[in-house]
Amino acid sequence: MLIRIKHKLLLIISAMIASMILVQAPLDADGRGQSRQDPLAKAFRADRNGWIYIHLEGGPDEIGYQHGYLLAREIDESLNVFKRYLPHTTKREWQFYRDSAHELFWKKIGDEYQKEIAGIARGAAARGVKIDADDVLAMNAWIELASYYVPSLRQARLADPEVHQSPPPSCSAFIATGSWTKNGAIVIGHNNWIDYLVGRRWNIIIDLKPAAGCRILMDSFPGFIHSGDDFYVTDAGLMITETTITQFKGFETEGLPEFYRIRKATQYSNSIDSWLKVMMDHPNGGYANDWLIGDRKSGEIARLENGIKNNIVERTRDGYYVGSNFPVHEKTIREETTFDAANTANSASARHRRWDELMKLNRGRIDITLAKKFEADHYDVVRKREAGSGNTLCGHVEVDELGLPEWDWTAYYPGGTVNAKVADSQLAERMSMWASTGHPCGGDFRLETFLKAHPEYTWQREIAGDMPSGAWTQFSITPRRLGEEVGVKPSLHPNDTDYEEAARRRRTGTNPTTTVPPRPPPQL
């Protein structure tokens, strides 16, 4: 009898141990006992009207991996563009950018964003892309390095205080509230100016749901942990955009990078005050901007001129702020730029005049419909004509015989507006925005037609391409089931198999120039 009782007890204990083993989470690669869940389970991608929409959710490792995996093709193509574009324009090879980004920024961005960046590299590498964390870091920092750090090195070498930066991403933006808008709430709009060979790839919409901090809806670029051209809506009620300060000079190697400050401020702020505090914390001067920010909860808007020596804030609940790459304050102009404020014919000043005209002409009427029209505006106040140019809010430098000398863009340079976004308080409350790819005026850029007329830019042929305009499209934060609800299965990529085969060939050196024509992407 005693033996049978002992036997039963042993069976019970064995069963209990077995059940504990079954429910215990298996060890992950690091042996930390975490669940081996599918890292893509909460993420998806869908393509719509020229935009690539991705939903990312989880901790920094997860959202990084999701990002890299879902945008592997686009990250690979963008990385290859930078490897050829930056040596041509800055005379510095990609390895310089990798080394500089790591030395200047890696330790400063903290554990969370280090993990996210490493995750992006791992996700893309899982799809066959030859990439590591330093590549992703350098991509995030390329504006700060190419347009601020490199000129600062030249300035130091030449001992010339007049050497200026010519930041490539330049924008036309506004924010208005109170008696200036149709219903008294905030309206915000922005379009992005940059070289078309880069800007045609600035077509990502990210619904970011991090494990900590605010949920963010933003436009972005492949591989970026931030928006880059900067248009954000957060579930804390903040609405954020900016325009770059033309001919800003100076770079502080000990300062905090802009891409880190804007991501941290946007993710962890629930008010204008808390957002400003992060943005003004040790700026390095890289990507120095005039920031426009609104709080839909209060209707208040603000502008931050975010330099190194000068951080000047204006706030109102009844008014507007506009941006077209002009430095606002005389002290900033004098101390931190080489900008000629007396020249009213340059692009920044001409667009500033046009913005003020549009605001005053439409006081009390500004809404989403007008915001879209503003961002597509083609009136040139210098030439006094209706035709896209380097002086119009919707920029077309490719047809401008003067180019943009203040940005070092020569005559007919293939650059200008590459996308546009607008939102108001009502949309922001629903975490939603309207966006269009390409020129918001509806004009298409056709590369071969352009190169026939301007063969001096033939060097861009291998890394550039057409940039068609897309219809204005509304985007919102969405659940994974969205695809099933509208009859489309969310895909990891519309051309998974062929892409991975092409990536394998590049890695092995067989047929390295092979390109895979994409199949038509799924449409929502």
Residue ranges, per PLM feature:
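Bacterial N-terminal signal peptides
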Residues: I12-I21
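Bacterial N-terminal signal peptides that target proteins for export
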Residues: L2-I13
